Amino acid sequence: MSEHIQLDLFDDLPQQGKPKKKRQKKIKPEEEPLEKKIERALWLLRTAAADSDQPIEVSYSGGKDSDVILELARMAGIKYRAIYKNTTIDPPGTIKHCMENGVEVMRRKSFAEVIQAKGFPNFLRRFCCAELKEYKVLDRSVQGIRRSESTKRAKRYKEPTVCRLYGSKKQHVEVFLPILHWTDADVAEFIRQRGIKCHPLYYDEQGNFCPKCRLGCMGCPQKSDRGLADFKANPRLVKFWLRNGEIWWNTHKIKKTKKKFKSHYEVFVRNIFFDRYDDFHNAIDNMFGKIDCKQFLMDYFGIDL
């Protein structure tokens, strides 16, 4: 008489045949060890360079990520030109740092010229980048963009090779992103391993390196505080913006802007201190009377205008 095995409804059935192999968990690019990331970065650079005898542009900003891609280009042994596009409003010491690393300094126009022609850039109108640094020099470019820098970049950049079109003539540039999947910890460790000397602003008074520090244009409206910390630390920067903003205000019709604002001082205050125009309008024109934005700026930053 054969023996029967009684199974409950939720018992697992006996396995028949060979057991299935467990799927190995796929490692995300960000989770790979640094050695593997370096290997991939060097392969990408050498592959990109093999397509042409012309040099590749290493887009250098003076920041830590720029130092990393410059070192990778050297390690890869490729033909390149490291180029810093001088915005004229980067932190002090940036040009000196570029010169110490053998980087070409190039300038198309100054930030003062941009303000005089177009007014103050803000979070919604970031025309300054296109005017000062987003333009074609060579057909191919290496850039230090990383997905871990922001959610916006993580969504926008998926692959380490992209095509960009610069300017009104839509000039084509093939862009390579060798450290796209690197974390802050990867960058800091690579800098330590290679003995890279970064911009002085990355170090505290004791000489400790800060991997989370970020450089950028002073007063940049894309920063989380819309550049307010830069203006508070450098009141002369406020005067510089306003001096050139006055030229823009006096030499351009800008009817829509002048319908909303009474002066360039008001435009500046709205851009720096308020997210929405309605909030600005309600703040300066309230039950206690209209606020003088020029006087407010003088008092807030301790400057004469």
Please provide the spans of the model-predicted regions.
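ATP/NTP-dependent adenylation/nucleotidyl-transfer catalytic domains that generate, transfer
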Residues: 7, 14-23, 199, 203-305
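ATP-dependent adenylation/nucleotidyltransferase module used to activate substrates
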Residues: 2-194, 303
